[in-house]
Curated annotation (Swiss-Prot):
Lineage: Bacteria, Bacillati, Actinomycetota, Actinomycetes, Mycobacteriales
GO cellular component: ribonucleoprotein complex; ribosome
Family: Belongs to the universal ribosomal protein uL5 family.
Gene3D superfamilies per record: 3.30.1440.10
Any one biological process term the GO annotation gives: translation
Species annotation: Mycolicibacterium paratuberculosis (strain ATCC BAA-968 / K-10)
UniProt function note: This is one of the proteins that bind and probably mediate the attachment of the 5S RNA into the large ribosomal subunit, where it forms part of the central protuberance. In the 70S ribosome it contacts protein S13 of the 30S subunit (bridge B1b), connecting the 2 subunits; this bridge is implicated in subunit movement. Contacts the P site tRNA; the 5S rRNA and some of its associated proteins might help stabilize positioning of ribosome-bound tRNAs.
Top-level taxon in the UniProt lineage: Bacteria
Gene: rplE
Subunit relationships: Part of the 50S ribosomal subunit; part of the 5S rRNA/L5/L18/L25 subcomplex. Contacts the 5S rRNA and the P site tRNA. Forms a bridge to the 30S subunit in the 70S ribosome.
Keyword tRNA-binding: yes
InterPro entries: Ribosomal_uL5, Ribosomal_uL5_bac-type, Ribosomal_uL5_C, Ribosomal_uL5_dom_sf, Ribosomal_uL5_N
Name of this protein: Large ribosomal subunit protein uL5
Gene Ontology MF: a single term: rRNA binding
Amino acid sequence: MTTTEKVQPRLKERYRNEIRDSLQQQFGSANVMQIPTVTKVVVNMGIGEAARDAKLINGAVNDLALITGQRPEIRRARKSIAQFKLREGMPIGARVTLRGDRMWEFLDRLTSIALPRIRDFRGLSSKQFDGVGNYTFGLAEQSVFHEIDVDKIDRVRGMDINVVTSATTDDEGRALLRALGFPFKEN
C-alpha cells in the first residue's frame, strides 16, 4: 500500500522557504507570527443588470466557480431602491472567499497567468492599499483567466479582487505582495 503525500501549492512553498525569511529580516520581526502573510482573498462580481434579468446571475456564478474552483455565494439586495427597480432579496452579485491552498493556487494563477494576459497592462497601482496592508483591485473582464472559454462568454463581466493580509501597514503589505509576484507600477 502506498501513501500519497499532499502536494503544497507552489506559491505557498515559495512563501515558506524564501519570502517569509526575507520579510522577517526586512521588518525586523522578533516573532514569526508578526511576519505578514495573506489571510484570505475575496473575489466579488457585482451584476447590477440582474435586477432586470435574473438569468444573468447564473452566468456570473458559473464564471466565478470556474475561475476560483469554489461555488460562489449569491449576494442579495438588503433593501429596496425604487430608482434602480430593485427589491429587497433580489440577486445582485456573487462572491467567493478563498482561504488555504485554494487561495495560494488562485494567487499563483492570478500573478503568473491572468495579469500578464491583460491587454496594455503596465502594472497594478501601488496606491490601492487601505491603510492596514490590504489590497483591492478590479479586473475589467473575466476572459483573462485561462479557465474561461472565450467562445462561451455570454457577456463581459468585471470583478473586484480583495487580498486581505495580516500586515499592519501599507508598506508591509506592499512588500509582501511584491515578493509574491504582484507587478506594481513604479511611481
